[in-house]
Amino acid sequence: MNYFEKQPQTKFQSQQEEYQKQLMRSKSPIFEGAEGELYYIENVGRWLPSPKIINRRESTKNLYKGIRHAALSYFQLNDIEWWGQSENLYFPTGHTLSSQIHCLNHLFALRADKDAVLALIQTLLPNICEILPSPIDEKFCHMDNYPYKTPSYISFEFTCENRTLLNERCNKRGANCTSIDVFVYAKDSDNKHVLIPI
């Protein structure tokens, strides 16, 4: 198998893509009526809105409204780049199938709720007995200008020595290097500390 060739979509991926397209076409309140990004269709000979990519001016509407401001602040204060925005890496992608966006929309609101994170993790890993504060976000809790004073139990865009271990150009969280979308730091029933990638 050649991993560099585009792989066929799974049934789930196809269903999700069609669902996102339906939401965009119907001007769903989920995306607050955002328009699709324009792209040129050669065989049609004109520019048409994308059925699954929100235009760059409205790309923040790809984030759930209830977490939008906090997620944007989290990325800015932690100097995390957004995936897929070549012009401005400080705004989220408009791609409605982005794993980065999906992780934030589903998990960001839980990040400070230790019990909720534990319950979520134990559905798959019942031997996890404690969720620990994130070591990469913990340092920011003590900064005067950092708005989140409670520990974070879910972290986003984790990297670790990418230059050395993966021979990549950078170690920066987010775009342009290999990152784990989400990770949780925990302790299992054997008292071992574990990193759980999501």
Task: Please report, for each region that a protein language model flagged, where it lies by residue.
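Charged, terminal alpha-helix-loop-beta segments
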Residues: 1-197
